[in-house]
Structures are given as C-alpha cells and as structure tokens.
C-alpha cells in the first residue's frame, strides 16, 4: 500500500512493520525547477535528501567550500516539500544548511543515514545538538554503516562501533526516533 501525502507518521510505522519509501538522494534532481517538487510528490516520492555532500541549487553540502546554508531556491524548495508531503532528509547537509532547515520549516525532518559526531569526529555526522533538535521536532535518525562514519580509524570499524553510536543516540533520547 502506498502511503498518501502526509501519512509519514509514527502510526504509519506502527501499522506497517515492513515499509519502503520512495526517496530522492540529492535535491539536484529538481534541476532548479520548483515545480519538480510537486511532480516528485505525485509519483510517490516521500523523502528527499537536500544535497549529496557538495553544493547544489538547494544549498551547501557538508563538503562544500561555500557553507551558505539554504539558497533562495532552497528556501522555496523546502517550503514546497512541506506543502506536498515530502519529508526533508538532512543527511549530507552542511551545519549551516541544517540550521537553515530548522529555521525555515515547521514539520519533522529526518537524517536517514547519519551517525554521532561525538563518537566519530566526521563532519558528515550529527552533533548532539542536531540529534536533539531532530528528536524535538519529531523526526527520525537512521544509522550509517560506512566505516569512515563509525570509527575515527575507519580500518578498525566493526559492529561494536555501530552499537556505540546506537547506545549513544539512545542516551540522548532517540529511543523512539532511531531507525
């Protein structure tokens, strides 16, 4: 069953034990055209990652030289995403983009594949404050199993590192927000 726009909620997760969502990873797929948000929503896209590490029309990724946050187009895009029920994914976003999303949006947003920056000091990971904001806004966080995000020495990454990130996020209040 395809969930309708706006049905991305806790009750949807409890009703459907096994779920899949149509997603777009990298808002660059909008091609700088705001009307593409509506088009993606109509074909069933429910989640969109705003950037993929680098700068795009929406804003700055974690590896962008220019850490501008959301662009003017990006501000329009996140408003349209909220309007059409596409959940914003801030994985790959710069810190500036993250906080612009906090200030420009009202609905929960998510980080589908991000770990704790306290455990592994990688700028791609989330700070404690960012984790707490996602929780407070009713969003979700999914762990990332990439070695470089799990351990400061990626060659040594193992399952224990996954557990460390999981336990740490749970200690910050992610008990119902960690996927």
Per-region residue spans from a language model:
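Catalytic core of soluble alpha/beta enzymes
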Residues: 57, 95-154
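A short, acidic, amphipathic alpha-helical segment used as a generic capping/interface helix at domain edges
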Residues: 162-172
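Acidic (Asp/Glu)-rich catalytic clusters
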Residues: 1-3, 8-15, 38-45, 101-105, ...
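Metal-dependent enolase-superfamily TIM-barrel catalytic cores that perform enediolate-based chemistry
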Residues: 39-95
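A metal-dependent hydrolase metal-coordination microenvironment
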Residues: 1-34, 62-83
